[in-house]
């Protein structure tokens, strides 16, 4: 109750921006979030058996869907984060394990779809009874065999520790369950013919090699599948108490006919009717006991899409989505300029039985599902990366020794430390924080294999980069690059991220590698494009993954507090140093390697001792004091290099060496610029390109004309170059949304914020917190009277921060003509009147006095304009830039909802005690109501002023 009491005031004050439902629904979601936090954070240190309430119980108690819960939880954490810190400590976010739970749900949803498709291809539904005429799988009644297979998989999956729980391993376990079903389900229920060579291509003299055939079809490893099948058989023997059949010849007369029994275990009468029911009961009990112990969500629902708790849509966070939305892929991977907004996961195609009934043989594996992409990239790791040596090649060693000092020992030692920090038990969530020595041998083997894959990939790409750099320099001395600490950490982080992304671990997800390696998002963004360019064999799924990461880095992560981008920006734009220091945005020094080794208890074995007790100054970003006092050429605020000029410069200077050089170091190939100016220029050009793509997509969705689109893009360009501070600690979409509305206002276009938000919700990168929670740091003198850090809705940010900052830029754009929506007639209104602004009515300029009753028939009091407020009022032209009264009185809410709320309160019959507070009623609101009665002229009201409350609109439900 303590957490709810302390957060209740936040709930009441933020009701209009928290959700799109009724107040009761919003309060219900809020209570669910509170209860989940208490159950996770308040029970720390208790035995697992005493953990109490689980998430599935919370969802049922508050009648919430999974998707709805995860849409509101991030916003809840933003609003009450400081309270959670005070109650539960600064590490509450890590202990909450919200991101891990999201990933687990996404994986289970993908695995559930994969299992449904595979089962329907292999076996008849409903125990051979004809299904109904509907083509939708989710309306068909699954058989007990179907339920048994999914339940067997869940029990098998729950036996794995959190360290190795990942989509790739789970898929292999699921295929092992399919193998068990194939050899035990009665032949009459099969949807395939075992003799058909197109179904099971791997054969020998003894019959079909089932394991090899399934590996070929589902892209799994034979070794991994054999190990998973052994685990499944052990589970059947230990939990279900079934004994393997010792007479192979007897078994081959039934389900094992024409199947090579080598490597397979057959349990006689295992799935006969009586045995099946008892086995289901045992598995149900085993799984439920595991749920009560671990407190996880009931994954049985993922075998049935109609489950009431499942819901539909995408999980909050943008990157994590429940599969089910069709998507199209680009054939070309590039920098964010070539990415598209359509990036939602693809839904699996519905199964259509073939005319001859042999669906398994005639259907193809659905491409581009989360499971199939994971298996494809895993095959690349097995076939291309795993066979490579775990040490630098001869050519790479020659590059190391050609430096001013042989850097071989430094590089190998660094790789061991950083990869050891990433691939340890502490890296895989709170549940595994006791390191690998307390995990099972299987976990340690899995982790060591992943570390070796990342190491081999790192050496492979590093060799390719060195080869390319040496060609540019016409020499093999790459000292400045190969001795750069930050560059190597970025390369190792990128390699490890690709390995982790391939296996899709539940607990070690981006940006975890940034924290483990000690780098920032801005650092990693420097190597992504080069990494892709120098690894030709990289699967397109991993290229897309890196592309999506680069977008995330550019859109918000590089702008967050503590980004090394600010350490370069303060050199390139010294005029921004005061604001950067005021907000405390500068990055902390990169932790040394010996500190990382000690923190993660990493043993280097036979490697040489650590030579990294102190990082050389030349490789680190210079401190802001040194950067601001050194003499250098300053990049003019409004100068912006073109891509052509950047391309010309890249021919004369290796981009990686300049990108990771000291910010204050002169760049001889850039006309006297410092490396910071060059790097910031490249970074901001990428920001501009990414913004251009999103502006185009959103404007097209809003059906805005090309002229409006160009104005919005021009405004964003000017903000990037002249008002860069608007992006500090914010998301670029927040600036784009405000630019679209601001341009619509000065272009006299009837476009509301509600329409913009409604269209933005349909964008694949949309996250509700983008428009619900915008960072502001109120100065000592602000219009709102607030001081310090805060998070406000997008409309408050637009009125209080955006417009005062960019108003001169909007004035320069000018109203010009009156562009209209495509396919809509132009309005013939007066050019001097602005859309969404209230009409002004005559109201005499009276001296300060008490409110006066102005109607004999209506209980209406009017507070005349006070002279004390005159200084704060805006001119009519200035008012036109703001979101004004007349559209709504609450954020994202329509006027009709305001009127309904007023009528409801008036008709409730409740007596309100106390006096009215006339200070909260805008004079203009009353003046407008009087003008409707008296027919007063709007023009004569100019003397009154135009102070208006902040516009707000309620989200559509």
Swiss-Prot record:
SMART domains: DUF3452, RB_A, Rb_C. Transmembrane segments: none annotated. The keyword Secreted does not apply. Residues 814-854 are annotated as: Disordered. Keywords: Cell cycle, Nucleus, Repressor, Transcription, Transcription regulation. It is found in: Nucleus. It comes from the Eukaryota. Its main location: nucleus. Residues 369-569 are annotated as: Domain A. This is Retinoblastoma-related protein 1.
């Amino acid at each position: 109750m303590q957490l709810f009491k302390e957060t209740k005031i936040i709930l009441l004050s933020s009701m209009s921006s928290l959700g799109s439902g009724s107040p009761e629904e919003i309060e219900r979601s809020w209570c669910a979030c509170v209860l989940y936090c208490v159950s996770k954070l308040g029970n720390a240190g208790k035995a697992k058996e005493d953990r109490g309430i689980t998430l599935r119980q919370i969802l049922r108690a508050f009648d919430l869907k999974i998707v709805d819960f995860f849409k509101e939880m991030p916003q809840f954490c933003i609003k009450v984060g400081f309270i959670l810190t005070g109650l539960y400590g600064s590490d509450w976010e890590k202990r909450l394990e919200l991101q891990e739970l999201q990933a687990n749900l996404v994986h289970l949803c993908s695995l559930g779809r994969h299992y449904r498709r595979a089962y329907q291809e292999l076996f008849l539904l409903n125990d051979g009874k004809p299904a109904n005429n509907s083509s939708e799988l989710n309306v068909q009644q699954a058989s007990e065999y179907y339920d048994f297979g999914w339940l067997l998989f869940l029990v098998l999956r729950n036996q794995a520790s959190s360290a190795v729980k990942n989509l790739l391993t789970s898929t292999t376990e699921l295929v092992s369950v399919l193998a068990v079903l194939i050899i035990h389900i009665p032949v009459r229920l099969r949807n395939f013919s075992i003799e058909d060579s197109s179904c099971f291509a791997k054969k020998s003299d003894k019959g079909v090699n089932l394991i090899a055939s399934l590996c070929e079809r589902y892209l799994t490893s034979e070794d991994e599948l054999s190990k998973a099948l052994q685990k499944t058989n052990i589970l059947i023997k230990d939990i279900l108490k079934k004994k393997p059949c010792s007479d192979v010849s007897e078994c081959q007369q039934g389900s094992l006919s024409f199947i090579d029994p080598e490597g397979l275990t057959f349990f006689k009468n295992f799935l006969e009717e009586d045995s099946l029911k008892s086995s289901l009961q045992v598995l149900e009990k085993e799984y439920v006991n595991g749920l009560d112990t671990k407190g996880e969500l009931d994954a049985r629902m993922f075998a049935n899409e109609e489950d009431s708790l499942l819901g539909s849509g995408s999980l909050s966070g943008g990157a994590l989505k429940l599969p089910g939305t069709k998507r199209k892929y680009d054939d070309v991977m590039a920098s964010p300029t070539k990415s598209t907004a359509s990036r939602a996961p693809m839904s699996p195609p519905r199964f259509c039985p073939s005319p001859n009934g042999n669906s398994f043989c005639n259907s193809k594996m659905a491409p581009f599902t989360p499971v199939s992409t994971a298996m494809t990239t895993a095959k690349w790791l097995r076939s291309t990366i795993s066979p490579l040596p775990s040490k630098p090649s001869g050519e790479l060693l020659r590059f190391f020794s050609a430096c001013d000092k042989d850097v071989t020992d430094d590089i190998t030692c660094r790789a061991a430390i950083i990869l050891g920090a990433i691939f340890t038990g502490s890296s895989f969530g709170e549940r595994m924080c006791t390191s690998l020595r307390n995990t099972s041998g299987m976990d340690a083997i899995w982790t060591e294999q992943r570390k070796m894959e990342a190491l081999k990939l790192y050496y492979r790409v590093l060799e390719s980069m060195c080869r390319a750099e040496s060609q540019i320099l016409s020499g093999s001395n790459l000292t400045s690059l190969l001795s750069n600490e930050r560059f190597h950490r970025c390369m190792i982080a990128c390699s490890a991220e690709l390995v982790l992304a391939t296996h899709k671990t539940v607990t070690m997800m981006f940006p975890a590698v940034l924290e483990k390696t000690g780098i920032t998002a801005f650092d990693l963004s420097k190597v992504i494009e080069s990494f892709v360019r120098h690894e030709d064999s990289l699967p397109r799924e991993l290229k897309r993954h890196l592309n999506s990461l680069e977008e995330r880095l550019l859109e918000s992560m590089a702008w967050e507090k503590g980004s090394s981008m600010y350490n370069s920006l303060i050199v390139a734009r010294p005029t921004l140093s005061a604001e950067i220091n005021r907000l405390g945005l500068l990055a902390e020094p990169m932790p040394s390697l010996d500190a990382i080794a000690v923190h993660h208890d990493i043993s280097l074995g036979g490697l040489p001792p650590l030579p990294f007790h102190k990082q050389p100054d030349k490789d680190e970003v210079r401190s802001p004091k040194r950067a601001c006092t050194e003499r250098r050429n300053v990049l003019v605020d409004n100068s912006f290099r073109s891509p052509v000029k950047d391309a010309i410069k890249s021919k004369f200077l290796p981009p990686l060496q300049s990108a990771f050089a000291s910010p204050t170091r002169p760049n001889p190939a850039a006309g006297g610029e410092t490396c910071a100016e060059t790097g910031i220029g490249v970074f901001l050009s990428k920001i501009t390109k990414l913004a251009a793509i999103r502006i185009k997509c959103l404007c097209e969705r809003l059906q805005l004309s090309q002229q409006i689109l160009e104005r919005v893009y021009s405004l964003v360009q000017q903000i990037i170059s002249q008002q860069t501070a608007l992006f500090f600690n914010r998301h670029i979409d927040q600036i784009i949304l405000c630019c679209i509305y601001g341009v619509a206002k000065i272009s006299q276009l009837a476009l509301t914020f509600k329409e913009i938000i409604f269209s933005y919700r349909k964008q694949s990168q949309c996250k509700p917190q983008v428009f619900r929670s915008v960072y502001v740091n109120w100065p000592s003198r602000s219009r709102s009277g607030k001081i310090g850090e805060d998070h406000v809705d997008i409309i408050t940010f637009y009125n209080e921060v955006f417009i005062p900052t960019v108003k001169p830029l909007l004035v320069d754009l000018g109203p010009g003509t009156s562009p209209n929506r495509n396919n809509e007639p132009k309005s013939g209104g007066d050019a001097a009147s602005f859309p969404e602004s209230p009409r002004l009515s005559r109201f005499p300029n009276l001296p300060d006095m008490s409110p006066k009753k102005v109607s004999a028939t209506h209980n209406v009091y009017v507070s005349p304009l006070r002279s004390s407020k005159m200084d704060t009022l805006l001119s009519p032209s200035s008012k036109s830039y703001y979101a004004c009264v007349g559209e709504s009185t609450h954020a994202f809410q329509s006027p009709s909802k305001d009127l309904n709320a007023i009528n409801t309160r008036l008709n409730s019959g409740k007596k309100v005690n106390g006096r009215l507070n006339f200070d909260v009623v805008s004079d203009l609101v009353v003046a407008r109501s009087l003008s409707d009665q008296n027919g007063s002229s709007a023009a004569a009201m100019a003397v009154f002023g135009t102070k208006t409350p902040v516009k707000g609109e309620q989200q559509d439900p």
